[in-house]
Amino acid sequence: ERREEFETLVKELNLNERVHLLGLRTDVPELLKAVEVVVMSSHYEGLSLSNIEGMASGNPFVASDVDGLREITDGYGVLFPHEDDKTLADIILKLSTDEEYRQSVIEKCKKRAEQYDISNMSNAYFKVYQGLY
């Protein structure tokens, strides 16, 4: 609904080479693997599959510190204060220049995403059900 507004802004800021508005996609996991940092800068969010997909991508996951994203990301990915573009830029720069930090974040993100893997979740539920009998 705001696509035209974003396209205009990209042109005005001369970001055509860096910003691509891809629209609705079915190949999200492949796209996430092609980026250096996954950023989710929402104003608000519930439990988001996008959050978990980003953490499972093999890249660092950075999210705004808002309800929903905080609960999944805190302690695994990197949170930045909501609407603080300076801090977001600093985090992206650090992830691009500090390989040890980058790898640490990637490993924690993968570990968190594994907790939401369907086979791990079904095994956990099975153990709970076994404990009831």
Please describe what each predicted stretch is.
Residues 60-63:
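Short hydrophobic beta-strand element within catalytic cores of glycosyltransferases
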Residues 24, 43:
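Aromatic "clamp/platform" in nucleotide-sugar-dependent glycosyltransferases that forms part
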Residues 48-51, 69:
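Short glycine/serine-rich donor-binding loops of glycosyltransferases
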Residues 6-23:
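Nucleotide-activated donor-binding/catalytic signature segment of Leloir-type glycosyltransferases, i.e.
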Residues 78-85, 94-99:
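Conserved acidic donor-binding segment of nucleotide-sugar-dependent glycosyltransferases
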Residues 29, 36, 58:
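A short alpha->beta transition loop at the rim of the catalytic pocket in nucleotide-sugar-dependent
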Residues 118-133:
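C-terminal alpha-helical cap of glycosyltransferases
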